[in-house]
Amino acid sequence: MSKIIDGKKIAKEIETELTSQVSLMSVPPKLSVVQIGDDPASASYIKAKANAASRVGIKLTHHHLSKEININELEKLVDKLNKTEDGLIIQLPIPKSLESVLERIKPENDVDGFHSENLGKLVQGIHGMVPCTPAGIIELLYRSGNDPEGKHVVVVGRSTIVGTPLSLLLSQKGVDATVTLCHSRTKSLHEHCKQ
């Protein structure tokens, strides 16, 4: 049976909770977002992040860089931000030649949870930074009264950003869903999704 989740209502609840938590901190958290190039979708995502950060009291700094930046310059910036910021996001997509910089972010500063150490912890069921979208999906499930324990969940897509981390989170002890991970080569996808 289908159930529509009121994501806006839940987001507002979470925002209220975060605002309260941040207000109790002696120093507000500092987050830097690094954008490379002029992708319109990236600009839109960053604007939404900046607005949300402002509403809860997080200090966000946007570093907008040319797509012509070289890896050495980018690594220097990331090294500097690793020392001064509480969190760091490299807004994707970025040129393939610069992707190695994601491993340069200190795992504890890796807000997106893309660093191989954080993904490795996720595989092992060890606490660490988790990719935001999968973590948000789990939070939505629980807050909407949809406990996945013992249920069969079909995840469509196996990206390292959403699908694979989500399937790992769902199957961890404490969440305990049975997961089928479908992808572009899955036969009869519609049959899996109807289950």
Describe the residue ranges of each PLM region.
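Positively charged, low-complexity intrinsically disordered leader regions
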Residues: 1-27
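Short beta-strand segments enriched in small/hydrophobic residues
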Residues: 28-38
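Short, ordered loop/turn segments at secondary-structure junctions
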Residues: 36-38, 65-67, 93-95, 106, ...
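Glycine-rich phosphate/diphosphate-binding loop of Rossmann-like nucleotide-binding domains
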Residues: 38-50, 96, 128-195
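Short beta-strand elements in bilobed, periplasmic/extracellular small-molecule ligand-binding domains
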Residues: 53-67, 177-181
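Short, well-structured alpha-helical segments in soluble
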Residues: 73-84
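Periplasmic-binding protein-like
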Residues: 85-93
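Glycine/small-residue-rich loop that forms an oxyanion/phosphate-binding "nest" at active or ligand-binding sites
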Residues: 92-135
